[in-house]
Amino acid sequence: MARSLKKGPFADESLLKKVDAMNASGDKSVIKTWSRRSTIFPSFVGHTIAVHDGRKHVPVYVTEDMVGHKLGEFVATRTYRGHGKDEKKSGVR
C-alpha cells in the first residue's frame, strides 16, 4: 500500500542532516545508515550511502533514477545460495 500523499515522503531526520551537511561542505564520503525505510530525495544524488542488510553495510551509489524509491529496495536481505546440486550418489550404502 502506498503512503498517503497528504503525509509526504519519509526520510530519517539524522540521515537528512548528514546529507545536507555534506552538500554544504562538498564532501563525498560514505554515509552509514540503518534506515532502509527512508525515501531517496533529490539531494541524495551523487552520494554513496552504506545501507545495513542485517549483517553488514552495503554501499549504494545514488543516481537520479533512484529518487522516490526506498533505500532498502537496493540492498537484498537474503542470500540466495542456489538449489541443491545433483551429486553422484555412491552405490555402496
Swiss-Prot record:
Keywords: Ribonucleoprotein, Ribosomal protein, RNA-binding, rRNA-binding. One of its GO terms (biological process) is translation. GO terms for molecular function: rRNA binding; structural constituent of ribosome. The keyword 4Fe-4S does not apply. InterPro entries: Ribosomal_uS19, Ribosomal_uS19_bac-type, Ribosomal_uS19_CS, Ribosomal_uS19_SF. PROSITE patterns: RIBOSOMAL_S19 (PS00323). One of its GO terms (cellular component) is small ribosomal subunit. Pfam families: Ribosomal_S19 (PF00203). Protein S19 forms a complex with S13 that binds strongly to the 16S ribosomal RNA. This is Small ribosomal subunit protein uS19. It comes from Agathobacter rectalis (strain ATCC 33656 / DSM 3377 / JCM 17463 / KCTC 5835 / VPI 0990).
